[in-house]
From Swiss-Prot:
Keyword RNA-binding listed: no
Gene: CHLP
Listed transmembrane segments: none
Keyword line: Chlorophyll biosynthesis, Chloroplast, NADP, Oxidoreductase, Photosynthesis, Plastid, Transit peptide
Protein species of origin: Oryza sativa subsp. japonica (Rice)
Location of the protein in the cell: Plastid, Chloroplast
Lineage of origin: Eukaryota, Viridiplantae, Streptophyta, Embryophyta, Tracheophyta
Name this polypeptide is given: Geranylgeranyl diphosphate reductase, chloroplastic
Role played: Catalyzes the reduction of geranylgeranyl diphosphate to phytyl diphosphate, providing phytol for both tocopherol and chlorophyll synthesis.
Pfam families: FAD_binding_3
Family the entry assigns: Belongs to the geranylgeranyl reductase family. ChlP subfamily.
Enzyme nomenclature, EC number: 1.3.1.83
């Protein structure tokens, strides 16, 4: 990638994208574009050039954003620090993501149709009986999914750069350029630490995860985060058969005081992990407890990889500043209670990119902060209720072992399972049957009353 002059005036006049970008963009412009309309106040870009956007981070959010930008006629550079990154992620994706993002089925390692919820006292409830034959939860490996989405973005015309984003300089005048500083990694030049380079863009999409440097630069504010710890375990074939279409979730103070432990199937191994917000120093103790709870089914297995990573607990206080915005984990789009983030990352990346394409009239006009705020407003309208409901569920049912027992008891109800899977698989809230809703409310209250009584009895025994 060509290093550009640090002189703002000169660089604005002589900005040159890498030849691979120019060639790629001509391919991208031949692809189908969104028909968009920019605001009348948006200034036209100088003749002969298009809107330039840097996407920082090459996970689901960054890959989806870069592809949509390139298809929409925007000159796009995606910067990813580690192209073979394996993230400690359960890897679950909803069924709607497969069709919505046109994912090939061979990307899905396992189709989970059975879920076992296991309470603190090891009471197990099987979930999945309400699923239709074609319905499943997809299990993917992040290193495979992320690489696929990046390659698709590259095919659409985006330039994928192996490098570490360092910081950005904000423009000194209206409609001026942002200067992106990064370390460019190239094994051929013999510089293991990378070569410092800069380039200019009109907008920046921060998709660089929970520890986002873009968020830090824009003053996005801090948030609570969980630490996720996961081991990939290669287990004997006869034990792997048990997990062919099954995943397990363990709840209890032993595996996590505020989250859950899991055993999720991958292509030829299982992922065993847990997470916590409140007791991060004890994460390895919780992981050992998760392994112990699953001992009978993973015994004889060999740990082939150990992973740890922060997971945001709620959206950041600020997600847009000028022509810089955040998507995915960088924005804090991970749901409480379930810890789901892949779909919301990809969805936010695409929605953000579509807002930029629309606001810039397919890359022919300067984008404005108001365009980016439209993406935020639409994302919040669609998904904010989901975040709030799961936040409440976590506070109610994860507060004690007695409450977790009540939670697992509720999961045995077919109506609960049907409503839960509908909302998860299709990311929609389907109106329920009023009579069933009343029954569910009564059962929930009953479960919580029993949980409270159980907690008091447990406290007496402890005393």
């Amino acid at each position: 990638m060509t290093s550009l002059s640090s002189s703002a005036a000169a660089a604005r006049a002589t900005f040159v994208m890498p030849s691979s970008v120019r060639g790629g963009m001509s391919r991208g412009r031949r692809m189908a574009r969104l028909v968009t309309r920019a605001a009348a106040s948006s200034p036209k870009l100088p003749s002969g050039r298009r809107l330039r956007v840097a996407v920082v981070g090459g996970g689901p959010a960054g890959g989806a954003a870069a592809e949509a930008l390139a298809k929409g006629g925007v000159e796009t550079v995606l910067i990813e620090r580690k192209l073979d990154n394996c993230k400690p992620c359960g890897g679950a994706i909803p069924l709607c993501m497969v069709s919505e993002f046109d994912l090939p089925l061979d990307l899905v390692d396992r189709k989970v149709r059975k879920m076992k919820m296991i309470s603190p006292s090891n009471v197990a409830v099987d979930i999945g009986g309400t699923l239709a034959p074609h319905e499943y939860i997809g299990m993917v490996r992040r290193e495979v999914l992320d690489a696929y989405l990046r390659s698709r973005a590259e095919g659409a015309g985006a330039e994928v750069v192996n490098g570490l984003f360092l910081r950005y300089e904000a423009p000194k005048e209206p409609n001026g350029s942002y200067v992106v500083h990064y370390n460019h990694y190239d094994s051929s030049n013999g510089k293991a630490g990378g070569e410092k380079r800069t380039f200019e863009v009109d907008a920046i999409v921060g998709a660089d995860g929970a520890n986002s440097r873009v968020a830090k630069d824009m003053g996005a504010g801090d948030y609570e985060y969980a630490i996720a710890f996961q081991e990939r375990v290669k287990i004997p074939d006869d034990k792997m058969k048990y997990y062919e279409e099954r995943a397990e979730m363990y709840v209890g103070d032993d595996v996590s005081p505020d989250f859950y432990g899991w055993v999720f199937p991958k292509c030829d191994h299982v992922a065993v992990g847990t997470g916590t917000v409140t007791h991060k120093p004890d994460i390895k103790k919780f992981q050992a407890a998760t392994r112990l709870r699953a001992k009978d089914r993973i015994e004889g297995g060999k740990i082939i990889r150990v992973e740890a990573h922060p997971i945001p607990e709620h959206p950041r206080p600020k997600r847009v500043a000028g022509r810089v915005t955040l998507v995915g984990d960088a924005a804090g789009y991970v749901t409480k209670c379930s810890g789901e983030g892949i779909y919301f990352a990809a969805k936010s990346g695409r929605m953000c990119a579509e807002a930029i394409v629309a606001g810039s009239a397919n890359g022919t006009r300067m984008v404005e902060e108001s365009d980016l705020r439209r993406y935020l407003a639409e994302f919040d309208r669609l998904y904010w209720p989901t975040y709030k409901v799961l936040d409440v569920l976590q506070k109610v049912f994860y507060r004690s072992n007695a409450a977790r027992e009540a939670f697992v008891e509720m999961c045995a109800d077919d109506y609960v399972q049907r409503m839960t899977f509908d909302s998860y698989l299709y990311k929609r809230v389907v109106p329920g049957n009023p009579l069933d809703d009343i029954k569910l409310a009564v059962n929930t209250i009953g479960s919580l009353v029993r949980a409270t009584a159980l907690r008091r009895e447990m406290e007496k025994v402890t005393l």
